[in-house]
């Protein structure tokens, strides 16, 4: 059931993350909110990571709801289905972790673009470009907008679970560091 539906669910998760990131930063750039927030006694990097935390929590809620729906469908249409909570939690955790680089990169893109439509366009182009790439190529499947399409069952089957978790964790940290550096450079030119 998961393998038949995950591609569409992953695409919806990514599109919702893109829209959320674009709207978060659009509200800051509208009416010069970014300049007003720069005088607050809080670092802009802290605000960015707060936004990332909000986006990660929303993503987690979406994945948990999707897993609950899949379990409900499996129980209804496949009476012989045996509910295994640990397997469902592992799958949900894996899906959240491999999607976090996409969320972080989209927040970085949205913070760099004052026009919401530019960042939204970049995000949508990346989604559809990387969704058509072959998912069996390990290098291409590790790109931020391609990794959410990976499933735990396929990663376990190919012994790539640790690779996906490590690379996605590293990508998330690198994009966070890149945003902090970008904020310092942007502050110099304002």
Where are these regions (language model features)?
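Terminal transmembrane helical anchor/hairpin motif
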Residues: 1, 120-190
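Hydrophobic alpha-helical interface/terminus motif in multipass membrane transporters
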Residues: 25, 34, 69, 73, ...
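Structural signal for membrane-spanning alpha-helices in multi-pass inner-membrane proteins
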Residues: 21, 62, 66, 70-74, ...
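Functionally important transmembrane alpha-helices
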Residues: 101-131
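Transmembrane helix-boundary elements of multi-pass transport/secretion proteins
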Residues: 1-32, 133-135, 178
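Helix-loop-helix units of permease transmembrane domains in multi-pass membrane transporters
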Residues: 24-56
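Transmembrane helix-loop junctions in multipass membrane proteins, especially transporters and channels
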Residues: 32, 67, 71-83, 114-115, ...
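Secretory targeting signals
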Residues: 1-17, 49-113, 153-167
